[in-house]
């Protein structure tokens, strides 16, 4: 019998700073973090305040697929 995957899943967090589009950036493009979350404890999408090296400032990172 195969084991179930469990409640932990890998998610991707993407920088959602729209003001950073027009500001000076270090590099072009969008920065992403990967992390895990417990599906049972946090069923909704996560939003975290993390540092974005592209925008060179702290931004809100939103969960994507």
Curated annotation (Swiss-Prot):
Keywords: Chloroplast, Plastid, Ribonucleoprotein, Ribosomal protein. Belongs to the bacterial ribosomal protein bL33 family. GO terms for molecular function: structural constituent of ribosome. GO terms for biological process: translation. Its main location: plastid. InterPro entries: Ribosomal_bL33, Ribosomal_bL33_CS, Ribosomal_bL33_sf, Ribosomal_zn-bd. It comes from Pyropia yezoensis (Susabi-nori). It comes from the Eukaryota. This is Large ribosomal subunit protein bL33c. The keyword Transmembrane does not apply. It is found in: Plastid, Chloroplast. GO terms for cellular component: chloroplast; ribonucleoprotein complex; ribosome.
């Amino acid at each position: 019998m195969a084991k179930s995957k469990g409640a932990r899943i890998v998610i991707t967090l993407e920088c959602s700073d729209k003001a950073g589009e027009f500001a000076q950036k270090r590099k072009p493009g969008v920065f992403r973090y990967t992390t895990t979350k417990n599906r049972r404890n946090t069923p909704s999408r996560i939003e975290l305040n993390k540092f974005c090296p592209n925008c060179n400032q702290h931004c809100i990172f939103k969960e994507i697929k």
